């Protein structure tokens, strides 16, 4: 929340009407960063992928190249096993939101948007983001045990929630996949939604 008194103290030398205008603008900006149950954390840009790579190699379970991965069963079935070589993928712009309370997928998507991405877009985003935090370092992805979630249209055409989170106990990135509405998400998880370059599929 905007601490109006602290801000007013800092701009006390300005005329009263100017102080009021500044506070109004700050409050409007803050309100625009939140929905009812989701807080906007910021935006990230994933560079275009121009070199073909094999996600089955760089995201294979186990430790390799200084990064360790663990795969959940649904992730293996719906994301990893059907994975194909990733070629050209356009620049992706995402906004990230943090859940403020326990929410189901339908509630989350009603607030942040219905956009979903395809697997090659997910692999490209993860290739950029996870390998900037290979040992759970600070960065765009949460590294405190909370999830980083994307809504992905899997190879079978079904939209599912796909997440990665840093498991500090085992020093590994845990990759998993869930059916929508399978359970609620606790507060403080991070959800990514894309811009108009991302495919839109009904909830």
Regions found by a protein language model. Name each.
Residues 1-115, 122-203:
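A binding-site-centric feature that preferentially detects glycan-recognition modules on secreted/surface proteins
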